[in-house]
């Protein structure tokens, strides 16, 4: 039971003492939890007890610092009706589904999937006594592939119903991002050809053994077998999709997996309907290995994005913007050398023929390398707007004063809500709240592509108090500002970090958990306009700002 560890056994009452060292200001009240494991007869019970203790000379809790719900905010009745509705549902799932579909098309070109198309279609054609039967079986097979990938998202819906912020917490978890970094490095080494990733053979064998069952059941297990045996190629692509959509919630995840499954399923269904098309398919060969190795370089670059996410939310300072861009430039150089046959990887050989398509890809990779190089410098050309959101922000730089950063709004940003509210009253300006995240791609795109536009930048500076609240900041709050909070839904959560506080503040008051989210309040903490999310259209965003400012003026 205790893994042979020595234990002390006590009966009846027991007093436990523990020395506690507090580096922060000492609070007037100390709250904590004790996890216990006790025996009563033959029954063993584990439980968690909370306690509180008064500390002499401690600092009293600042109630304003623990305020979450703004009673003055009515999400259904803003002062002016511009922007999105307060109960807006993100329609970005269509974009995610399209990206998932593209990921599925890429997966089709891998050595694990592509050769299966003619083999599977031929199997259905020969097995069925009529052409109609072959078409039916092929379509059912494709449908099962689609449903298998969609079904993979069901657990995430169950998790999301318990805590809506769970997806944002997952996507911004420092240690989870480090795990993904290691996994994607592992995937990329595999794609380079140094070893093969496979699921346990027993899983594939068990699914394959069921494929001989009656018509529908057999076809389902054939589809399941394909999903399992192709994992070594589809796994990295699926992993990118899962992580990329995690912060958008369960429905975006479902949309992405649906797009992926649809792309994989369509060829099997279409070739079953039109078997003559098989003759136009290119034959399997070395080009499939080339596709896999090109994907390896992409996976390697993506791995450092995950490490960067962890670095940003924890403020480790490991991957400053220039270091990150430099690593991507090295990966791009490696891809260039590979495409021209200068860099040889496992299964390549001296003198092998380099196709025109591979050479053209090498040219693209070389041009991309040239594009990245200014990103390492301290010049106005270092913005890399095409990649906005992927490298760390310009503020996270090796250079103390970055020239490219001067175009934006960063010097005017406040990160303290109470300070912003005081300035709003003092200057008679509305507060523009920017719910953002260190690991938020779309937040960086808005900051680097929209806020840097002179018209937008000057309008915000002149008319708003700009407040940026980071919902994924893992820095711990002073101990006097940590507390337990019961949400409006009745769930209890611990507010320990800066991110905990502002993520809860956003969800409770504005009923949304995605970033970026822009909210305008007046100095009475009333909602002026409907909040808006990611708005890359400069004219549309500026129009919303002007409408919000007019609403503040006319109130």
Feature map (PLM): residue ranges:
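Extracellular/lumen-exposed scaffold segments
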Residues: 1-90, 382
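Short active-site neighborhood of thiol/selenol oxidoreductases, capturing the structured segment around
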Residues: 105-106, 426-444
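Hydrophobic, well-ordered secondary-structure elements that form the walls
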Residues: 262, 296, 435, 440, ...
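Non-catalytic, surface beta->alpha helical segment in thiol-disulfide oxidoreductase systems
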Residues: 450-456, 486-554
């Amino acid at each position: 039971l205790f893994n042979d560890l020595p234990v002390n056994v006590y009966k009846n009452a027991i007093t436990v003492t523990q020395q506690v060292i507090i580096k922060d200001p000492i609070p007037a009240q100390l709250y904590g939890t004790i996890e216990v494991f006790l025996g009563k007869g033959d029954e063993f019970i584990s439980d968690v007890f909370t306690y509180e203790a008064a500390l002499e000379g401690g600092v009293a809790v600042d109630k304003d610092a623990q305020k979450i719900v703004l009673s003055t905010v009515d999400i259904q009745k803003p002062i002016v009706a511009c922007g999105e509705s307060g109960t807006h549902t993100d329609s970005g799932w269509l974009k995610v589904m399209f990206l998932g579909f593209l990921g599925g098309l890429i997966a089709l070109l891998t050595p694990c999937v592509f050769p299966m198309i003619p083999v599977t279609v031929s199997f259905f054609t020969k097995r069925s006594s009529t052409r109609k039967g072959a078409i039916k079986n092929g379509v059912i097979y494709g449908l099962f592939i689609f449903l298998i990938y969609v079904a993979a998202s069901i657990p995430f819906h169950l998790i999301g119903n318990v805590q809506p912020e769970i997806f944002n917490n997952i996507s911004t978890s420092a240690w989870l991002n480090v795990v993904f970094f290691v996994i994607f490095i592992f995937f990329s080494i595999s794609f380079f050809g140094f070893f093969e990733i496979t699921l346990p053979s027993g899983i594939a064998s068990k699914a394959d053994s069921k494929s001989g069952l009656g018509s529908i059941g057999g076809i389902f297990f054939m589809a399941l077998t394909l999903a399992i045996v192709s994992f070594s190629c589809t796994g990295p692509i699926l992993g990118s999709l899962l992580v990329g959509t995690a912060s958008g919630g369960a429905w975006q995840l479902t949309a992405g997996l649906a797009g992926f499954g649809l792309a994989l399923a369509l060829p099997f269904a279409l070739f079953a309907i039109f078997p003559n098309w098989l003759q136009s398919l290119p034959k399997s060969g070395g080009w499939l290995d080339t596709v896999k190795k090109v994907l390896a370089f992409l996976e390697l670059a993506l791995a450092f994005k995950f490490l960067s996410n962890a670095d940003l939310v924890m403020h480790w300072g490991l991957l400053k913007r220039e270091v990150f861009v430099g690593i991507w430039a090295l990966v791009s150089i490696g891809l260039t050398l590979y495409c021209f046959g200068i860099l040889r990887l496992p299964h390549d050989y001296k003198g092998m023929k380099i196709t025109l398509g591979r050479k053209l890809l090498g040219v693209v990779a070389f041009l991309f390398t040239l594009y990245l190089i200014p990103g390492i410098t301290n010049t106005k050309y270092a913005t890399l707007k095409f990649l906005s959101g992927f490298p760390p922000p310009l503020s996270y730089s090796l250079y103390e004063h970055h020239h490219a950063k001067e175009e934006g709004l960063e010097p005017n940003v406040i990160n303290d809500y109470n300070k912003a509210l005081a300035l709003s009253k003092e200057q008679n300006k509305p507060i523009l709240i920017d719910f953002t995240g260190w690991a938020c791609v779309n937040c960086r795109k808005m900051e680097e592509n929209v806020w840097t536009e002179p018209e937008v930048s000057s309008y915000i500076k002149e008319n708003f108090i700009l407040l940026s609240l980071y919902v994924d900041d893992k820095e711990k709050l002073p101990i006097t500002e940590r507390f337990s909070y019961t949400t409006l839904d009745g769930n209890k959560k611990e507010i320990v970090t800066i991110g905990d506080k502002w993520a809860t503040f956003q969800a409770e008051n504005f009923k949304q958990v995605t970033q970026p989210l822009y909210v305008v309040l007046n100095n009475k903490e009333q909602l002026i306009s409907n909040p808006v999310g990611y708005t890359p259209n400069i004219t549309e965003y500026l129009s919303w700002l002007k409408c919000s400012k007019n609403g503040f003026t006319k109130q």
